[in-house]
Amino acid sequence: MSENLIIFNARIVTPTGTSARKGAEMGQLRIIENGTVEVTKGIITYVGESRGEDRDGYYQHYWHYNARGHCLLPGFVDSHTHFVFGGERSEEFSWRLKGESYMSIMERGGGIASTVKATRQMNFLKLRSAAEGFLKKMSAMGVTTVEGKSGYGLDRETELLQLKIMRSLNNDEHKRIDIVSTFLGAHALPEEYKGRGDEYIDFLIREMLPVIRENELAECCDVFCEQGVFSVEQSRRLLQAAKEQGFLLKLHADEIVSFGGAELAAELGALSADHLLQASDAGIRAMADAGVVATLLPLTAFALKEPYARGREMIDAGCAVALATDLNPGSCFSGSIPLTIALACIYMKLSIEETITALTLNGAAALHRADRIGSIEVGKQGDFVILNSDNYHILPYYVGMNCVIMTIKGGMLYPVN
């Protein structure tokens, strides 16, 4: 199959632009009836109404696909996941059902520490195979770009191993998903540094960041800025050092309590602040003013039985909101794009149009990719999804059920069985 592709007879539905859409802009989509998209060598070269399938034989080396009037959307961007890990934590789910909190499970040695132990015991091939399995499931739900975090090693060897696995998968010539790697060494305090959080931050700054940067293993640096994990000052120190070394910045912020994480993201000019269940009004305003993408993770709130982030208020305050799954082995063992969409509409009060923007262009902006993915426009990558309907309103209507029938990556067609 060729990377040269013509999709015709499509109902094209897309946000537009090369930066995040904020506030009311998020609800503005371009819709083209009976549309055609041309992709040449993986890049979009035409978007518009049909102009005939052959111009002097120009299209003879193109694969033709009749969308039969179905909706054609940009490929989904899952901009916050933890898909490289060992083990599983199903027992913790039953603990939460009995009333234990996320933090209380961490305090008793479960949570992230449990996955760290399992991940440290696995080798490259086993971890890579498991991660590849998750990527295949993501592709079937229309994801064409994903962010993946380290953070289940919390030591030099295993953190680098996670990042090398993501690089290996991203360099696979048969890949269906582009991977943006994030270093999350500050995911939790490892047992060997218990009570010595400042020393662990020193270790990350002096021994991890330079090696990762030199070997181009990650573009972004993230930190779990939360009460009982890493303080605002510790987070600031790590992220400032990362920024000086050329990393883009992301934060796990204000998930458990209002802790000043959103404000810190704005202060440092982070790409995104993620979770934000407890973000303050001041933090929301600061993110809007600074252009920080608010990445919301409704599946995690659902699984933890926590209040949802205030998506509607954030958009109304002028924020750029993205949506992601937060696939991980503990608080959210799900990569369900369909359920993410439904929860965002039902509980975060986003419109269907806003969820599309949040999962495409704004997700791309949260990964510093809005200039090349996230919308169906000339010059961007030929990454799309085709739905099983001409009505994109089915996205939340299909609660937890997949309505994607075709994922297209760089002009390559991948039917969904």
UniProtKB/Swiss-Prot annotation:
NCBIfam families: hutI
Gene name linked to the record: hutI
Alphabetical GO biological process terms: L-histidine catabolic process; L-histidine catabolic process to glutamate and formamide; L-histidine catabolic process to glutamate and formate
GO molecular function: imidazolonepropionase activity; iron ion binding; zinc ion binding
Disulfide bonds: none
Reaction equation(s) it catalyzes: 4-imidazolone-5-propanoate + H2O = N-formimidoyl-L-glutamate
Keywords: Cytoplasm, Histidine metabolism, Hydrolase, Iron, Metal-binding, Zinc
Cofactor note: Binds 1 zinc or iron ion per subunit.
Gene3D superfamilies (UniProt xref): Metal-dependent hydrolases (3.20.20.140), Urease, subunit C, domain 1 (2.30.40.10)
Subcellular location: Cytoplasm
Pathway given in the UniProt record: Amino-acid degradation; L-histidine degradation into L-glutamate; N-formimidoyl-L-glutamate from L-histidine: step 3/3
Primary localization: cytoplasm
Protein's name according to its UniProt entry: Imidazolonepropionase
Family, similarity comment: Belongs to the metallo-dependent hydrolases superfamily. HutI family.
EC number: 3.5.2.7
Residues binding 4-imidazolone-5-propanoate: R89, Y152, H187, E255, S331
Required co-factors: Zn(2+); Fe(3+)
TM ranges: none
Keyword flag Zinc: yes
GO cellular component: cytoplasm
InterPro entries to which the protein is assigned, alphabetical: Amidohydro_3, HutI, Metal-dep_hydrolase_composite, Metal_Hydrolase
Primary enzyme class: hydrolase
